[in-house]
């Protein structure tokens, strides 16, 4: 598995509850651009329309050697999931008010592009502060243990 890009902001802004692996519908120049230069997850999210899941605001830069038929960098891209998974996602988003965010995009062992999406709940500002405090405390404890071996 070759990871192309990860959404680091997702882990700090959301509590991730569940993850799914989804295929993604891409054009040829998009796959070439992913192999060449990667992707940008800034402000990307998933939306469900007509029983299909779409990935919005994922920026895949244009392919350098492309011609006039090059792709639009921020077009909505359809995610390929089983119907059961889509229905489960719809239920969680509507009933519990959760959001679907992409966390990782990668090539699997067969060379196919996959997106890891997560069902997540947004963190409040005080939750983020608590996480930072916990990280600092753990860092200090580990530093203390290293010194006093």
UniProtKB/Swiss-Prot annotation:
Entry's localization field: Cytoplasm
Primary location class: cytoplasm
A GO MF term: RNA binding
Keywords attached to this entry: Cytoplasm, RNA-binding
GO biological process, one term: trans-translation
Pfam families linked: SmpB
Function: Required for rescue of stalled ribosomes mediated by trans-translation. Binds to transfer-messenger RNA (tmRNA), required for stable association of tmRNA with ribosomes. tmRNA and SmpB together mimic tRNA shape, replacing the anticodon stem-loop with SmpB. tmRNA is encoded by the ssrA gene; the 2 termini fold to resemble tRNA(Ala) and it encodes a 'tag peptide', a short internal open reading frame. During trans-translation Ala-aminoacylated tmRNA acts like a tRNA, entering the A-site of stalled ribosomes, displacing the stalled mRNA.
HAMAP family: SmpB
Family: Belongs to the SmpB family.
Descriptive protein name: SsrA-binding protein
């Amino acid at each position: 598995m070759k990871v192309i890009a990860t959404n680091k902001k997702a882990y700090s802004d959301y509590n991730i509850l569940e993850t799914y692996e989804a295929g993604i519908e891409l054009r040829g120049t998009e796959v070439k651009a992913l192999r060449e230069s990667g992707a940008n997850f800034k402000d990307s999210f998933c939306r469900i329309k007509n029983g299909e899941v779409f990935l919005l605001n994922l920026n895949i830069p244009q392919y350098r050697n492309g011609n006039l038929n090059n792709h639009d960098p921020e077009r909505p891209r359809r995610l390929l999931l089983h119907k059961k998974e889509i229905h489960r996602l719809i239920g969680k988003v509507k009933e519990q008010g959760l959001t679907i965010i992409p966390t990782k995009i990668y090539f699997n062992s067969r060379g196919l592009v996959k997106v890891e999406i997560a069902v997540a709940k947004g963190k409040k500002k005080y939750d983020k502060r608590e996480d930072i405090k916990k990280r600092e405390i753990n860092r200090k404890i580990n530093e203390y243990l290293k010194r006093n071996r």
